[in-house]
Amino acid sequence: QSDLDSKIGMALHITFNSIRKVWQDFKGDHVVFCLEGRSWRKDFYEPYKRNRKNARDARTEKEVEEDEVFWETFDNFKDFIDQKTNCTVLRNDVLEADDLIAGWVQSHPNDNHFIISTDGDFAQLIAPNVAQYNGVQEVMITHEGYFDAKGNRVKDKKTGEEKPAPNPQWLLFEKCMRGDSSDNVFSAYPGVRTKGTKTKVGLQEAFADRDSKGYSWNNMMLQRWVDHEGY
């Protein structure tokens, strides 16, 4: 139990220190906590994130006990933030934290927003007034590119070139087409290429043709695909 108490204490220590650090570094004037609810996506696609349930079911008895203590501590932390500070705490029974963050950004278009998360999906929200900070990698993602803690541009480890600024529209389009294995979402077009060939249209060509909706847009996916469960 003492070992578990130490883990919980360290987790709270790291959490509060992290909040203080980003508050000071980014000169914040308000903090918003967005919490998970049951996703509405499960009502439309039952297998959504089922793989995570499988992982939970495989936990040992000790891991289950530790998780119970963790969630009890989390509830206390949430109540403290909600009742004893001026932070905003958002939660909805059918929305994920991602949905709430996107909604907050969209409903406050005149404010500058810093999303503190390691989740790559938030690159879809990047805009002149929206940046993301990955505290693990110490990387800031803005509409101008990726920057390290010293303000230098981050280079792609594979190409050695500077990582270009994310294109939110492209990222959303690619995610919709390729699916997301981490969320157990099947690809809408299995095996689709990023760049097309002489005989097949790729994602890049279709994306470039999305406004005029010409040949590439209408000929990228000529079949209907279903996953192994018939969705």
Feature names for model-found ranges:
Residues 1-116, 122-147, 160:
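Noncatalytic, basic helical substrate-engagement surface that gates or grips nucleic-acid strands
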Residues 139-188:
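A short, charged helix-loop
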Residues 169, 174-231:
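Accessory alpha-helical DNA-binding modules that contact the DNA backbone or grooves
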